[in-house]
Amino acid sequence: MTKAALYTLTIATAIGTGLTPVPCCAYALDAQLDCKSNAHAFIAPLLTDQYIDPKPMRVEANSVNAFRPAQGSNLTAFGFRVYAVLGYEHGDKMFKQGSGQPITDSAYGAVVAGSAEDVEARVREAGSDAVVRQVIPLLLTAIFCNRQ
């Protein structure tokens, strides 16, 4: 191998290593998705620590607010990358009201990249009783805690 080729390979490896996500720096939401909390307690620390954008990217008619993970936040849930963080708590100024009837007094969760079957298996393995629903087949799945 020539000196130039070796140098190019070394630089490419160094750059690639620097751009690869580091699993040790990911912030896992597993413990909070045990469904023993409320939306305010779930969302507030994520906003304070700037893991999610403060303005919801979407507010559903049932008042569920979808927050986008902040750039570089590396949020995970049960080992899956988080696409969106969900939440709504009645009477809490942190959440915007939708146009329809609110889903419940307090609900929270996450949308992750993974199939519903794989996500459900990991959620149950962790002992959570969260509701797991397919959003986009084989791509996105919602993990949802709904307190009545």
Q: Residue locations for each model-derived region?
A:
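Sec/Tat signal peptide C-region and signal peptidase I cleavage site
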Residues: 19-26
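Amphipathic alpha-helical segments
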Residues: 38-52, 112-127
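Positively charged n-region of N-terminal signal peptides that target proteins for export
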Residues: 1-4
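Long, charged/polar, surface-exposed segments that mediate recognition or autoinhibition
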Residues: 69-126
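Short, ordered beta-strand-loop transition motifs
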Residues: 57-63, 71-72, 99-105, 131-140
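N-terminal secretory signal peptides
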Residues: 26-85
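Bacterial N-terminal signal peptides
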Residues: 8-18
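C-terminal partner/receptor-binding element of secreted or periplasmic proteins
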Residues: 123-148
